Amino acid sequence: LVDVEENEAGKHLVSHPEVDRVILTGAWETAKLFRSWRHDLPVLAETSGKNSIIVTENADYDLAAADIIKAAFGNAGQKCSAASLIILVGQAYRSERLRNQILDAASSIRVGSPSDLRSQMGPLAEPAKGKLLDGLTKLDPGQVWALKPVRIDKEGRYWSPGVRGGIKPGDP
């Protein structure tokens, strides 16, 4: 097991002819980069993606809201299986009750140090930057904040939960 940066040393190691395969847990862009360095190299990758929860009109809205909050904000949303996209179908989309349950639960999450037993959501692994910072602070055209995330600390590791609406297919 070797932890490799995306620099010249990483490129040299990944593209070396004696490397039989690469197993990667990381970003899709990193997997593509590794393949660009050596096209014949098998890259077995678990990459980031859009994990979705679909809620239909037949769903138990109480259970759906609880599952959405846990899946989206557990581990500060940093788990590879975190739900980053919620799809509400039919009446579920129009349900003010479901919307309020989700927003009330998200806005009531207590953010703080993991050593504080009252905390329900801890810090980001590192200060928000790049795509993550953009996701916490910027909206794409047509999107709105249903619940705008707020930076809580100076360093940028603690953020309140955020919920955006108006997501369209193809949005990042």
Annotated model-derived regions:
Residues L1-D20:
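A structured beta-alpha segment of the ubiquitous adenosine-cofactor-binding alpha/beta core
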Residues L1-E5, D153, D171-P172:
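Short intrinsically disordered, low-complexity coil segments enriched in acidic
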Residues S15-R21, A27-P169:
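ALDH superfamily catalytic-core signature
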